[in-house]
Amino acid sequence: MFANYHTHTARCHHATGEDKAYVEAAIQNGFQVLGFSDHCPWIFSDGYVSPIRMTPDELDGYVTSLTALKKEYAADITIYIGLESEYVPEMLPEQQKFLQDYPIDYQILGEHFLYPEQRGIYTGRPTDNAAELKHYVDQVIAGMETGNYLYLAHPDLFHFIGDPVLYEQEFRRLCVYLKEKQIPIEINQLGLADHRQYPNPAFLKIAESVGNTAIIGCDAHHPSALLDIDSQQACKKLTEQYHLPLVEVFPQLSR
């Protein structure tokens, strides 16, 4: 792989490893570009503290550490400072205000929740609720329409186990939108390696028929994920099997 834009750090409280170890693993495996995109902090008005993302107080250290690594390894690899974030409309203004003074190169949209996290409605849990599926697709499209996000992480995270006709209808709508906007779909290495419900063959068949492009995201939660050549090759084989041209460079990011 030439590039990976989906990399976490220990600050999200469910990843492990030093920041430098991720960089050195990427260099060892021949990456030319490494984008960090740890789970973005949210400002919870009720004082809730998320166990699965960095806290607002940790963002300074994240940016400081990665800025230093950018300089230290400039001759070996291009490093970007990004964030993975949900699009939750009622919380977005406060988040944008909080982030505006930080040198964030990009964000990717990872829609793990459709509502503020403390409500506990995770989109990866099995459901046959058609209204929730439509809400997921509507909200992802609305999020991408803001222009805040480089691409959509694990688009097939939503674990719909209901009517396959509805699944095809709604995810086709999403794939058509992404194609029109020239946004690649992510083939998620973590999901593949961990035998999760994604990458989902049903979703990939839809993407193939629509003519989407794809990007491979390591979704690294440990430096070793960047060295998992077998899983990376398996992801690449999926792009070939479903005839999804691979995207690895984004012109809007300067090197």
Segments (PLM) and residue ranges:
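Domain-core and long-helix interface of multi-subunit machines
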Residues: 108-210
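Short helix-capping segments at alpha-helix termini
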Residues: 71-77, 210, 242-244
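Active-site core of metal-dependent hydrolases
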Residues: 184-193, 217, 221, 232, ...
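Mid-to-C-terminal alpha-helical segments outside catalytic/metal-binding sites
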Residues: 213, 229-255
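Short amphipathic alpha-helices and their capping/turn segments at secondary-structure boundaries
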Residues: 19-32, 90-104, 136-146, 173-176, ...
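An N-terminally biased module of ancient metal coordination in phosphate/nucleic-acid-related enzymes
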Residues: 1-87, 99, 161, 165-175, ...
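Hydrophobic alpha-helical segments and helix pairs
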Residues: 77-122
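Active-site gating loops and adjacent loop-to-helix segments of metal-dependent hydrolytic enzymes
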Residues: 39-57, 103, 108-125
